[in-house]
Amino acid sequence: MKFIDESLIRIEAGDGGNGCVSFRREKFIPKGGPDGGDGGDGGDVYLQADENLNTLIDYRFNKRFAAERGENGRSSDCTGRRGKDIILPVPVGTRAIDNDTKETLGDLTQHGQKMLVAKGGYHGLGNTRFKSSVNRAPRQKTMGTPGEKRDLLLELMLLADVGMLGLPNAGKSTFIRAVSAAKPKVADYPFTTLVPSLGVVKVDDSHSFVVADIPGLIEGAADGAGLGIRFLKHLERCRVLIHLVDIAPIDGSNPADNVAIIESELFQYSEKLSEKPRWLVFNKIDTMSDEEAEERVREITEQLGWEEDYYLISAATRKNVPPLCRDIMDFIIANPREAETQQVAPEEVKFKWEDYHQEQLAGYQFDDDEDWDDDWTEEDDEGIEFIYKP
């Protein structure tokens, strides 16, 4: 299945149903009074996280989703039916962004979590609502308000504890294959990894963590070189970044310069991401003796001014890999996941039409009651005042 981590869709909540102007008509009751019912509220649009999904491919071609409109009110004080909501399933880790305002509406980080992204229109009021001691035959009603409409950008960001960084062919996919059951493609050419992949690393019977592998970065990735930096967003929720460095690049480049390239591209993408805990892990030490590897790493760290701890491993032979995994697990246990971006609960969303009818009724001035025409029918709109026109 093709991996799709971004999709722009159009969502439209349902419009509110209109109120009804009607009067009670019964034998021997010439002036039965108003009995026009309210309309129904428009349907809402929700996103719901589903752990069985891992891509946004369902929204690659199907781009428009609309909730049902509320029904109009009817005579005999009948209220219109509320429009049906629609719930759009998305993978866990999806972020919803208003494409016009760039406002983040919320993140869905748990299975079953639901988020309101477009609220339906408010129902119109029937003429029964306007009756009073001085207006016993009101011919006023309100129209339902339009539902909210958005161009919604869906961004899928993988939920992983550990993120892998490095140039192409640094050995990231080989490392994933060595520590987990994941089997990303491994080959002797750059950009073998084209899309992010996840692997679950089981340290012991009761402890495990998730590691994310993304396509390699090259110099100029921030300007679109290579595969660009679009996949770096998948590292935003990681607790620690593992910077895998080829200790003996086949092209003869300086590993210290390669580290600096990744640091620069990371900073250009996001200063916050560049400040995440980052460990240097030197790979492919099996290509030289232990003494030569230690000497080369010492030179690299001196050039970088690196004063933190570092690791020397061989992902191909799994040399020194288990101790690294145990240290990662200890770090994860000691540093619980930070709270995700504040979620927008449906009850906290303030819709623009929320106080519309209260304001209309509070400011409406009723005229003195006048005799009304017995020949008036529901089909006759003459004399009807529309409080709101969309």
Curated annotation (Swiss-Prot):
Q: Any idea where the OBG-type G domain is?
A: 160-333
Q: For this UniProt entry, what's an example GO CC term? A: cytoplasm
Q: Name one GO molecular function term.
A: GTP binding
Residues binding Mg(2+) are 173, 193
Q: Tell me which EC number(s) this protein carries.
A: 3.6.5.-
- Which SUPFAM superfamilies does UniProt cross-reference here? Obg GTP-binding protein N-terminal domain, P-loop containing nucleoside triphosphate hydrolases
Specify which residues bind GTP according to the UniProt entry for this protein: 166-173, 191-195, 213-216, 283-286, 314-316
Q: Which domain of life is it from?
A: Bacteria
Give the Gene3D superfamilies listed for this entry: GTP1/OBG domain, P-loop containing nucleotide triphosphate hydrolases
List, alphabetically, the InterPro entries matched.
G_OBG, GTP-bd, GTP-bd_Obg/CgtA, GTP1-OBG_CS, GTP1_OBG_dom, GTP1_OBG_dom_sf, OBG_GTPase, P-loop_NTPase
Q: Keyword annotations for this protein?
A: Cytoplasm, GTP-binding, Hydrolase, Magnesium, Metal-binding, Nucleotide-binding
Family annotation (Pfam families): GTP1_OBG (PF01018), MMR_HSR1 (PF01926)
Location(s) in or outside the cell: Cytoplasm
* Single Gene Ontology BP annotation: ribosome biogenesis
Q: What class of enzyme is it?
A: hydrolase
Indicate the segments forming the Obg domain, all copies: 1-159
Q: Which cofactor does it need?
A: Mg(2+)
Location (main, coarse): cytoplasm
Q: What does this protein do?
A: An essential GTPase which binds GTP, GDP and possibly (p)ppGpp with moderate affinity, with high nucleotide exchange rates and a fairly low GTP hydrolysis rate. Plays a role in control of the cell cycle, stress response, ribosome biogenesis and in those bacteria that undergo differentiation, in morphogenesis control.
Q: Which family does it belong to?
A: Belongs to the TRAFAC class OBG-HflX-like GTPase superfamily. OBG GTPase family.
Q: Quaternary arrangement and interactors, per the entry?
A: Monomer.
What is the name of the protein in this document? Answer: GTPase Obg
User: Which species is the source of this protein?
Assistant: Haemophilus influenzae (strain 86-028NP)
